[in-house]
């Protein structure tokens, strides 16, 4: 039998390769006609395909199945006035069936691995008292947000890609993007809180505690969920179902409505891509870079004055810091292609450029690779914890392999020893502080 780390590593490589193949398959297709929209599996939203008009059905000029020349607007047009839309892109407009199947397989793998990994992670932290500390509770909050997204969003988005028509009603049309944005918000804010927590743990040695959840961590988790839900409300308000004519068929499409009723929602629709890129991608990277730099400087400054008895405790803190950094790195790698595709379209796309079709084809490939990579982020955190953290690896082995009758009984000897070391280090540090206090007085 192959060792479990090898199997996890191979499964992870297979998932990433599948995401790339899905993007390559998407490259072999061109764009659907104006008015058609494509579902974004794993993002909980619909994206208007890159056509020459933003409102579905407004013009048939970009439909390759229509006449070769653009239609003249009703009432004709005056001489000397150029047409409103450039010539259409040539090529087929069908989505490759192979891409649909590959995307479905990737979504099913994410669904299965995500449910198993995140539910196991929650069970480990809930059952094992040694794992109930501030950073792990934040990781549990992150896993719970991913689990909600996996259970609700991924099946619906997969069905949406295969069926094209939206059959679930207005309520689900608003709920799916709301949960998706709330889940990403929980992930982003949890990673920020973990990075700040690692710096505070190094900078304030009086905060050393063995087992238990600090009150401030509980307040942080409540704030993270409340802020994430509030920031996701515009998605529920703005998304709606519209009816579009597509080759003689009326399709119900769930998307961010092109015409919003309020000035705020119109501004949100206009600035959405930049808002998502800045808050949901750049913020956790900037926070992590800032506080990990401060943490490194603090550890180098205090290195000479640290007591040898605290070495085991410092090793545990370095492992936690390495784990948090790994989670942030995985998040950045998974979400970079999708955000890069959207930003490139906003900054470089010109509908009057004669080479726009090739550029849109490249963006479409990048977009679909990004969609699958973003979905992968919902299931990859437990795998990353297993590969990086020895403590989580032991707990995952005990919980998944079922070596004993119950989780409490099968807790490894190494975990018990780590708990004893944790308490002993705290006691040793208290004695160290007391001796310094009396010696200074």
UniProtKB/Swiss-Prot annotation:
The modification Phosphoserine is found at residues 304, 418, 434-435, 439-441. The keyword Cell inner membrane does not apply. Residues 27-100, 163-174, 243-270, 350-361 are extracellular. Residues 54-70 have a biased composition (Polar residues). Keywords: Cell membrane, Disulfide bond, G-protein coupled receptor, Lipoprotein, Membrane, Palmitate, Phosphoprotein, Receptor, Signal, Transducer, Transmembrane, Transmembrane helix. Residues 126-136, 197-217, 296-323, 389-441 are cytoplasmic. This is Endothelin receptor type B. It comes from Bos taurus.
